Amino acid sequence: MAIYTCVLLDIDNTLLDFDAAERQALTDMLAEYELPHDEHACAVYHQVNRELWDALAKGQMNKQKLFQVRFGRFMQAMQLPDNGKGKAMNDRYEELLSTHADLLPGALTALEELSEVATLAIVSNGAAAVQAHRIAASGIDRYMDGIYISEKIGAAKPSAKLFEHALRDLGITNRSRVLMVGDDLLADIKGGINAGVDTCWYNPRNVENKTDIAPKFTVGSYEELYRIVMEPEELENLGVRNRRHSNEALL
């Protein structure tokens, strides 16, 4: 039996390449509105967006407000006149974002291996419609025992409520065997800590942790994650077990 029998997973930049999706959707949308869409514009948007999502994680803003003000703040930061189309720009950006579901290298193999030994579930703060489309398009849904999006649940990471809903729905009672894996310290790791489960910071870029948030584990690859989740005998059987989802993959 695995060391961790339930693994909760973030989506963006943990399983799917959100940075690439964000950049493409953003530049396409800005081009449609005949606005600057160069590297500088992308960097400004990323900073504005990061600040807003951090405010959401701290309980200072809800998601509806975030989506309403995001591109108005961007226009202001770019020193561009407010065109009054911030909400329409956001809607178009989200629509374009939903069409991008690029997997990070090795993600499907990792899910295939982990799903052999543990209950897997997604816990995400993304927009429900966008994430649902990206999850289905990427094929990661077939490995999941549950998918929990904050917009549907009514609570966002790092609130323990989202995690508690997921664990209750999954029938998980022993939190000592639960591991939360994600790339965002404030949302994923702090959220897991708030929920009383062990945490693993997925940090393939070796970003410095400048916060006081302390994950139990830090990994730079899925292979390192295997060694945290699996018992030694399970590690020896990587790639050779009967596939729990093999028939589904052929449908």
Kindly give the residue locations of the regions a language model identified:
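A short, Lys/Arg-enriched amphipathic alpha-helix followed by its capping loop at the start of a domain
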Residues: 28-32, 110-117
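Transmembrane alpha-helical core positions of polytopic small-molecule transporters
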Residues: 96-100, 125, 156
